[in-house]
Amino acid sequence: MSETERTLVIIKPDAVVRGLIGEIISRFEKKGLKIVGMKMIWIDRELAEKHYEEHREKPFFKALIDYITKTPVVVMVLEGRYAVEVVRKMAGATDPKDAAPGTIRGDFGLEVSDAICNVIHASDSKESAEREISLFFKPEELFEYPRAADWFYKKGI
C-alpha cells in the first residue's frame, strides 16, 4: 500500500537568480507530486538558523546562512506517494559534482570557488519534513484539493 507524505522543498538563491523556478516546479508536477503550499519569501537569519540547526557546529554554517538569506527563495510543500524519498531521488546528491545527470542538482547545480550552489533543499526524512514544514507554513497555508483524475473521473466537477 502506498503512503502519502508531505515534504518541504526550498528553491535556493542560486536557482532563483538563474531563472530556474519554473523548470524545477515543472519537474515535480510532471512526476505526479501535488503542490499543497507554496510561497516566495526572504528567509531572515533567525529562521535560517532554526532551519539548519543540525549544522550549527559545522565549519560551513555561517556561509550556509549567508547563502540562504542572500535573495528570496521559493518554499513549497509537495504531497504524494513516498514524497520524501521521491523528492530526494529527484534532487540528486547534495554535492552537484556527485549528482547524476537527470537529477535537479546534476542538471543545474554548480560549484563556484568553494561554494556549492545545489539549487534546492529537500527534507531528508518524514520527521524533518514535519519539522521544516511547520517552520515555513501555518496549517491554513496548506491546501487539500483533488488532482485532475479525481476531479474529472471520480468525484465529478
From Swiss-Prot:
* CC cofactor: Mg(2+)
GO-annotated molecular function: ATP binding; metal ion binding; nucleoside diphosphate kinase activity
Disulfide bridge positions per record: none
Any keyword Nucleus?
A: no
> What positions constitute the catalytic site?
H121 (pros-phosphohistidine intermediate)
The record's section on InterPro entries has: NDK-like_dom, NDK-like_dom_sf, Nucleoside_diP_kinase, Nucleoside_diP_kinase_AS
The main place the protein resides is: cytoplasm
| Record GO cellular component, one term | cytoplasm
Enzyme Commission code(s) on record: 2.7.4.6
Q: Where in the cell is it found?
A: Cytoplasm
Q: Mention one GO biological process in which this protein takes part, according to its record.
A: CTP biosynthetic process
What this protein is reported to do is described as:
Major role in the synthesis of nucleoside triphosphates other than ATP. The ATP gamma phosphate is transferred to the NDP beta phosphate via a ping-pong mechanism, using a phosphorylated active-site intermediate.
Q: What is this protein called?
A: Nucleoside diphosphate kinase
